[in-house]
Swiss-Prot record:
Gene: dapD
Domain of life: Bacteria
Any one Gene Ontology cellular component term annotated for this protein: cytoplasm
Name recorded for this polypeptide: 2,3,4,5-tetrahydropyridine-2,6-dicarboxylate N-succinyltransferase
Species this chain originates from: Yersinia pseudotuberculosis serotype I (strain IP32953)
Self-association and partners: Homotrimer.
Length: 274
């Protein structure tokens, strides 16, 4: 694996000079191999090690390099044709392979090669970009987007129109992460490497980036870039120091544990915020 990483790191330093016409065989094979490993879930761009999320930057570099080594090509879809550098994940799947891997894909859901989809996942008409990791039992609902290299945990529900930010455009240091057992409400956006920790509930229409203030109304604490585990979050505003205006924030209205979540529905958690 170290040899593979060395090839990627070296190639990335000269990425501006690499084209589909001049890329050498060793570099092409290394990049292609990494994309295959990401595609099967054998590798992932970020993983939790000793309780902390660690980003493997060299894998992200391999994803970026993959755009340098391929020309656009025509790809066939059920109702249309595509023209892009990155092939579709399911292009070579037959019924036996879909059954073996154990997830559902509802047309016209689109997944790029290099994204991993785990068992018991349901993809409604949605989009999952290269390098993403979607773990077991997750629902990616209609028109939701899982950005490049984003990490989605087990038993997550990404509601209709949710946007989970990627790392490629604009270039971000770390992927956006939604941990296990989280719910993200319709049309919400979580971007710029924000981490939503386990068991959190994000209401409809909440927008969280690295500069978004995440205000805990019980403690008065303000978080940036991280939603603490078990938080129930709605959109809100905080006043300026002189009271002349207010600016958008996300508000943690309560904390819940796994026991409470198992007994109380998502809608009830969001409706009883007083």
């Amino acid at each position: 694996m170290q040899q593979l990483q060395n090839v990627i790191e070296t190639a990335f330093e000269r990425r501006a000079d690499i084209t589909p016409a001049n890329v050498d065989t060793v570099t092409r094979e290394a990049i292609t191999h990494v994309i295959d490993l990401l595609d099967t879930g054998a590798l992932r761009v970020a993983e939790k090690i000793d309780g902390q999320w660690v980003t493997h930057q060299w894998l992200k570099k391999a994803v970026l390099l993959s755009f340098r080594i391929n020309d656009n090509q025509v790809m066939e879809g059920a109702e249309t044709r595509y023209y892009d550098k990155v092939p579709m994940k399911f292009a070579g799947y037959d019924e036996a392979r879909f059954q073996h891997e154990g997830f559902r894909v509802v047309p016209p859901a689109t997944v790029r090669k290099g994204a991993f989809i785990a068992r018991n996942t349901v993809l409604m008409p949605s989009y999952v970009n290269i390098g993403a990791f979607v773990d077991e039992g997750t629902m990616v609902d209609t028109w939701a987007t899982v950005g490049s290299c984003a990490q989605i945990g087990k038993n997550v529900h990404l509601s209709g129109g949710v946007g989970i930010g990627g790392v490629l455009e604009p270039l971000q240091a770390n992927p956006t992460i939604i941990e296990d057992n989280c719910f993200v409400g319709a049309r919400s956006e979580v971007v710029e490497g924000v981490i939503v920790e386990e068991g959190s509930v994000i209401s409809m229409g909440v927008f969280i980036g690295q500069s978004t203030r995440i205000y805990d109304r019980e403690t008065g604490e303000v978080h940036y870039g991280r939603v603490p585990a078990g938080s129930v979050v709605v959109s809100g505003n905080l006043p300026s120091k002189d009271g002349s205006y207010s600016l958008y924030c996300a508000v943690i209205v309560k904390k819940v544990d796994a026991k409470t979540r198992s007994k109380v529905g998502i809608n009830e958690l969001l409706r009883t915020i007083d």
